[in-house]
């Protein structure tokens, strides 16, 4: 997911996306444990997407504090 797409979403959409990414990460980790042939970089990409979403949410929260 691109950072431009993340920044264009509202806070509620980002929180929903964060929940979905968390579920997706759990499923990916479990599938990786069961099936060794899955793409190992997929989990890393999900973690990076989660970090991007959290970064945008924290930036917005800090911005609201200063205003």
UniProtKB/Swiss-Prot annotation:
PANTHER family: 60S RIBOSOMAL PROTEIN L35/50S RIBOSOMAL PROTEIN L29 (PTHR10916), LARGE RIBOSOMAL SUBUNIT PROTEIN UL29C (PTHR10916:SF0). InterPro entries: Ribosomal_protein_uL29 (IPR050063), Ribosomal_uL29 (IPR001854), Ribosomal_uL29_sf (IPR036049). This is Large ribosomal subunit protein uL29. Keywords: Ribonucleoprotein, Ribosomal protein. GO terms for cellular component: cytosolic large ribosomal subunit. The keyword Hydrolase does not apply. Gene3D superfamilies: 1.10.287.310. It comes from Ehrlichia chaffeensis (strain ATCC CRL-10679 / Arkansas). It holds the Pfam family Ribosomal_L29. One of its GO terms (biological process) is translation. GO terms for molecular function: structural constituent of ribosome. SUPFAM superfamilies: Ribosomal protein L29 (L29p). Belongs to the universal ribosomal protein uL29 family.
């Amino acid at each position: 997911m691109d950072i431009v797409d993340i920044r264009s979403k509202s806070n509620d959409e980002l929180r929903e996306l964060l929940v979905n990414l968390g579920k997706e990460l759990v499923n990916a980790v479990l599938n990786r444990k069961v099936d060794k042939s899955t793409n190992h970089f997929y989990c890393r990409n999900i973690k990076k997407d989660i970090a991007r979403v959290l970064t945008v949410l924290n930036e917005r929260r800090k911005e609201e504090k200063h205003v």
